Amino acid sequence: MSLIPSLSLLLMSMVAASYSETVTCEDAQKTCPAVIACSSPGINGFPGKDGRDGTKGEKGEPGQGLRGLQGPPGKLGPPGNPGPSGSPGPKGQKGDPGKSPDCDSSLAVSERKALQTEMARIKKWLTFSLGKQVGNKFFLTNGEMMTFEKVKALCVKFQASVATPRNAAENRAIQNLIKEEAFMGITDEKTEGQFVDLTGNRLTYTNWNEGEPNNAGSDEDCVLLLKNGLWNDVPCSSSHLAVCEFPI
């Protein structure tokens, strides 16, 4: 029987302790029976367990990282197209008058006359030793025997043409020049039997030998001046004396 009061007292102490956190001592004295006694607050307990994760939040704005270091310069690009021409610059100042060398007109005239005299002397020497002159033509031979094609090439090389007599005087001049039969600038290569000069013009003077031209062998397309001054048709591939005609 002595244990009952002790158990009742212990139970009331536990009830009073459970209200100590929310009920002040003064309130307890007003509302609780006289047997309830106030005590000091108890020691805090251990932290509770973590609660559950909350709902997923909205996506935040992108962050901004730190600016990196400046890289090395890149390679040079290809050159661009040329730009448009610029506007002309201002006109320059007028230059000083130039200086011309002193000319002695009398000396120039005397030198020109001396040159003309020398050229005339050389022409006379050539005429006497190698060629013949008739009017404004000068006939010259190198004394070589060659085909008609080579004779043409030789005369062209010296800005001349193959000798072609236009009258009896020119025919006689060539005859007096040669010591062998010589080619003349006359052919019928384009039209058989129609002899023309090397410019294609028909002849106004001829001096054919008796029975010529006869086209013997069907290939006599070139013309020779014989040593007696008469003409004869022969093959152009044969070799005869070269005589060139120079205008003067």
From Swiss-Prot:
GO biological process: complement activation, classical pathway; complement activation, lectin pathway
InterPro entries: C-type_lectin-like, C-type_lectin-like/link_sf, C-type_lectin_CS, Ca-dependent_lectin, Collagen, Collectin_CTLD, CTDL_fold
Biased composition (Basic and acidic residues): 49-61, 93-102
Disulfide bridge positions per record: 155-244, 222-236
Chief location: secreted
Collagen-like domain location: 42-99
Highest taxon, organism lineage: Eukaryota
Feature: compositional bias, Pro residues: 75-87
Post-translational modification: Hydroxylation on proline residues within the sequence motif, GXPG, is most likely to be 4-hydroxy as this fits the requirement for 4-hydroxylation in vertebrates.
Cellular component GO terms, alphabetical: collagen trimer; extracellular space; multivesicular body
Domain notes: The coiled-coil domain mediates trimerization.
Biological role stated in the UniProt entry: Calcium-dependent lectin involved in innate immune defense. Binds mannose, fucose and N-acetylglucosamine on different microorganisms and activates the lectin complement pathway. Binds to late apoptotic cells, as well as to apoptotic blebs and to necrotic cells, but not to early apoptotic cells, facilitating their uptake by macrophages.
Subunit structure: Oligomeric complex of 3 or more homotrimers. Interacts with MASP1 and MASP2. Interacts with MEP1A and MEP1B and may inhibit their catalytic activity.
Name of the protein in question: Mannose-binding protein C
